């Protein structure tokens, strides 16, 4: 069976030209029930919400809208609609950080510790007595904390009276995109800040000088630096580079390095096979060179190499594992000075640098 609120939600999706999203999230049966309401105007859905609850619809438009927004069905449908549209925009927004950040769940807003154990002694041959020797475990750790980020979303009663749901759609989508942008902003703010000299010569993960520019030799050097990372006792960590992260200014160079079948040798000036072809995937991130937002920490020349998220170069944590924003309904009377229904949109997340051995930064210039 399809609930009254779901039928109204399906009809709203149809009215907004989002039938495909409705089919995907509610299913064909719900969309069919929505179509059966034959809603040619948003006021028809207000009337349906009142009818579902056995309330006679007032004759005046404003009175009808106000009465409908006091029912269960219409506010629930609008809230679910806001959630779906917002999350649709959120999931479609670029998130380059997912290529190299481990995802974690935290149960509170306290400081949490991201620990990456490092077994500093290899497995040893078991003797005839069957005794297994104890090894030692070292740890790389970093602290992270989840914070709350949010905004309010409102739909004025006049938009319902005027059958104008485009503002609602555009606002919800804008909030969805803004939510993902805020996560990305925080990730790259932390990455570029380089707290605790995460990228440094001492950690073997920071390349400088003219030969650190993105080139065949520069990328080969970064790959080598990561693959040569060892623990405190000299054991190889077997890290494998997975993602090359570059600003838009370096995307052509990056794609040429990783996609071309041949490269031009400088000395002989003859093409030769490209041994770096498809060595890693490439991600283009405009925040890396956004000096307006990140000041002199941003650059059009620097670039990064990361191992896979399982190696935990960085962590992004979400409260109780909820990776998407939360949408809460507040009703028509939430603000006495404003005749509008309001939703609160908020997102709880945090991020931190964790294991410097799983990342390399190249300055890209002398």
Predicted regions mapped to residue ranges:
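Short gly/pro-enriched beta-turn/loop segments at secondary-structure junctions
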Residues: 232, 237-241
């Amino acid at each position: 069976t399809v609930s009254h609120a779901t039928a109204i939600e399906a009809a709203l999706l149809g009215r907004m030209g989002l039938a495909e999203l409705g089919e995907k999230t509610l299913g064909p049966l719900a969309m069919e029930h929505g179509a059966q309401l034959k809603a040619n105007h948003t006021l028809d859905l207000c009337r349906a919400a009142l009818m579902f609850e056995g309330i006679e619809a007032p004759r005046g438009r404003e009175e009808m809208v106000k009465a409908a927004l006091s029912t269960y069905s219409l506010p629930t449908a609008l809230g679910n609609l806001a959630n779906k549209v917002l999350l649709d925009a959120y999931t479609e927004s670029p998130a380059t950080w997912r290529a190299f950040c481990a995802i974690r769940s935290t149960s509170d807003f306290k400081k949490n510790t991201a620990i990456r154990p490092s077994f500093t002694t290899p497995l040893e041959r078991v003797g005839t007595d069957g005794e297994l020797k104890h090894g030692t475990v070292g740890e790389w750790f970093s602290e992270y904390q989840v914070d709350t980020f949010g905004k309010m979303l409102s739909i004025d009663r006049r938009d319902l009276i005027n059958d104008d749901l485009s503002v609602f759609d555009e606002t919800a989508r804008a909030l969805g995109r803004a939510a993902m942008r805020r996560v990305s902003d925080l990730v790259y703010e932390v990455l570029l800040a380089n707290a605790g000299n995460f990228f440094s010569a001492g950690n073997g993960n920071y390349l400088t000088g003219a030969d650190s520019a993105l080139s065949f030799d520069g990328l080969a050097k970064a790959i080598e630096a990561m693959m040569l990372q060892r623990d405190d006792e000299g054991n190889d960590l077997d890290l494998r580079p997975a993602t090359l992260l570059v600003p838009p200014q370096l995307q052509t160079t990056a794609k040429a390095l990783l996609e071309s079948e041949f490269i031009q040798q400088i000395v002989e000036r003859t093409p030769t096979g490209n041994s770096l072809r498809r060595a890693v995937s490439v991600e283009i991130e405009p925040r890396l060179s956004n000096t307006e937002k990140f000041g002199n920490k941003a650059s059009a020349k620097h670039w990064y190499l990361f191992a896979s998220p399982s190696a935990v170069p960085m962590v992004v944590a979400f409260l109780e594992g909820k990776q998407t924003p939360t949408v809460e309904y507040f009703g028509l009377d939430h603000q006495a000075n404003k005749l509008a229904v309001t939703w609160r949109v908020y997102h709880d997340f945090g991020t931190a640098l964790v294991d410097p051995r799983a990342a390399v930064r190249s300055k890209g210039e002398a």
